[in-house]
Amino acid sequence: MTIHLISFASILHKQVSLRSSHEAILSEIEKYYTVKFVDHQDMDKLSSDDFKIIFVATGGVERLVIQHFENLPRPAILLADGMQNSVAAALEISTWLRGRGMKSEILHGELSAIILRIHTLYNNFQAQRSLFGKRIGVIGSPSSWLVASNVDYLLAKRRWGIEYVDIPLERIYEQFKHNTDDQVGASCAAVASQALACREGTPEDLIKSMRLYRAIKKVCQEENLEALTLSCFKLIEQIDTTGCVALSLLNDDGIIAGCEGDLQSVFTLLAVKALTGKDGFMANPSMINSRTNELILAHCTVGLKQTERYIIRNHFETEKGIAIQGLLPTGDVTIIKCGGECLDEYYLSTGTLTENTNYINMCRTQVRIHMNTPAEYFLKNPLGNHHIMLHGNYEDTLNEFFQANACKRTE
């Protein structure tokens, strides 16, 4: 892990070396990172993949910094340890930058706190850069009922660097035809043998589901997709199977896969994975109790690796094909959803997964969540239907990231 320190020092202080004047802070940073000093005149030689901090080494550099405004890293992270009047200069610089719409932050104080903050900023930077250039396949088209889940492809690319790629379902149908039952026999046996039970569905249904999985994965490889969202209900009309098993296994393979052509939710899944390394469970808030502050999240697919055990079921709405009833571990969870046509809004909360439910009138994988914030959000100010649940409390990590990217938090 490398930090590029862009150094600004007054000519009045050049007789004192940067290293000796700031030994304490530099030695501490070097315990965790490789530090490369970059003269401010050379900062334009750095690439967008380089993590940069502006090192305010002395006072008297205020005008020098603003003269290089166009080349400064964004956001502007100013390191000032207090030596050589550096804090005084950093205060002036930060105020000037923020007055011109640039996010700015001063790193100063206890060494341990500075290091923790650098860790957070570095992880945010790495996550943001990892999103850049990612291709999200939109296989088919968004479901007609997702009227509030649109994304403007161009605005999303400008903000996040991601690319939504439209792929016709005919590509999947063609690959599906080429896959034979014999090719998927072993995979079907593996999924069936590890299931806790099989309540509905036939061997033929499972074979079709596995052929679909192979077809989608092949297209993902051909299109170099990091993620996809599938128009799964239209599949049922054409090939008489659901996408539940395919999406489950694709997520286990590391290909982020969402349902119903939901453009906002698949980005949420991708961003969450970039920041935390965790896969999410995309689900419908199916029951909401604002008095007890509980909700039930439900959907017919979940990554098998997210479950403790799973049961093979059929699809709830159509009673066709194969769905997954995952039994998920109890404990702390995070609920998140990115919204807005340019993905500049988000909802974020935490809670406790208290039980796996088994209602007959909702999707197969069901979990009850006791929320740490008012569940009234879902009734009064929701960001659409689908929300993402991941195991663990990642509120601070996710909030820091979206705030740093000028997103508006909805509560």
PLM regions: where:
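Structural motif
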Residues: 6-17, 40, 55-59, 81-82, ...
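Extended hydrophobic packing segments that form well-structured cores
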Residues: 323-411
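An N-terminal, globular interaction/scaffold subdomain
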Residues: 26-93
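Hydrophobic beta-strand segments of well-ordered beta-sheets in folded domains
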Residues: 1-8, 50-54, 73-80, 102-104, ...
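C-terminal catalytic subdomain
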Residues: 255-355
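Conserved, well-structured core segments that form the ligand-binding/active-site neighborhood
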Residues: 95-275
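N-terminal basic/disordered segments at the start of proteins
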Residues: 1-39
